Structure formats: C-alpha cells, structure tokens
Amino acid sequence: MTDRNAKLLDTLKKDYPDAKCELNFDTPFQLLVAVVLSAQCTDKRVNIVTDELFKVAKTPSDFRKMPLETLEKLIYSTGFYHNKAVAIKSLSDDIVERFGGKMPENFDDLKSLRGVGNKTASVVTCVALGGNALPVDTHVFRLAHRLGLSDGKTPDAVMNDLKAEFPENCWYDLHHTLIFHGRYTCKSQRPSCDKCNLQEFCNYYNENVRNNK
C-alpha cells in the first residue's frame, strides 16, 4: 500500500471510528435478506421493514413457506417489492434444497444462490461471515473515482482496483469508512467539501472547488 493510500485510509478511520454496517440483523441469513431489500432503498427504511418482517419469518424455511403476495406486502415500502420478494423466495429455496437449510458460509456458495449477486455476497461475507471481501456500492463506487483510486466503469472493475491498492486486512475498514464518508459528507449531488478532511486526495475538490475559489 502506498503512503498516500495509507494516509487516506488513516484519515477515514479517524473521521469515522464507529463505521459499520447500519442494517439490523441477528443472523447472517437475516443480513442476506436485508441486503437484498437495501437495493435502491435506505438502510433506515430497510430496518423499519425488517423489524416487523423478522417477527414473522426468521429462517429460509420460514420465507420458503410464506406466500409471495404476503412477502410483497411486508416489504412493499422498500421499492421494487416484487423482484425483491422473488429473490428472497428463490434464495431461500436454494438454501433449503441445496444446503439443507443452513446458511452458506463462503462467497462462492452465496453467489451461487438465485437472486444473489457479487455485491450482496460480498457484503454478507465481509460483515457477517468474517471473510475477506470488498463490496462496492454506490458510495464506494463514487468515492473511488473522486479520490483517484479507480476509473473503473463497473462495480467489479472498481472492486478489483481497490483490492490492488489496499491489502486484505484493510478491506473491511475501507468499505465501511468509504460508505460513511459518502453517506454523511461526500454526497452525490452536494458534497460538503468544506467539512472534508480528504481534500488533498480528491479529484472532485481539485477540479470543481479549489480552482473556483
């Protein structure tokens, strides 16, 4: 890792010492469901929904038995409720039929589930299973470009660039601190550049703010 990247990550960790996944869950399977629901939805809204959802369904078997229409109603407010309900039902079927009802414990098995892509499998691996993964959501994707860490056109390309720039033991902290920075400071439309401690690293600041002062 370069001195520049080490300083960048150290600054992020100092600014967000409590950065972590903000989705509420008790088991890795519940996190898997929550991550599916989080697509195009805020963590706050997902937590409101899962607070009620997990009272009536906690396991793959529970979701497998639940009628699709019932699940759709319970998750309606997260948006794209039909697609999300189908995904949750499908992955629950796979876990019961292929894994005996036990939650897969590695990235490859998670990714093999219907309705589970790279990002979802990476989040569960990183957050709940203690594995080395580096999920790239919209915040990580945006900041990787603004901070000059990647010019990748896809989340997978950005993920590969970040993995090349930072050692595995930094991936967890990098993922969560970038999300917090993107969520609370470096927002998509109106970033709070005046409050940011990463100005020296930031292409966006240098091109759009400093040169206009």
Where are these predicted regions, by residue range?
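Catalytic cores of DNA base-excision repair glycosylases
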Residues: 2-212
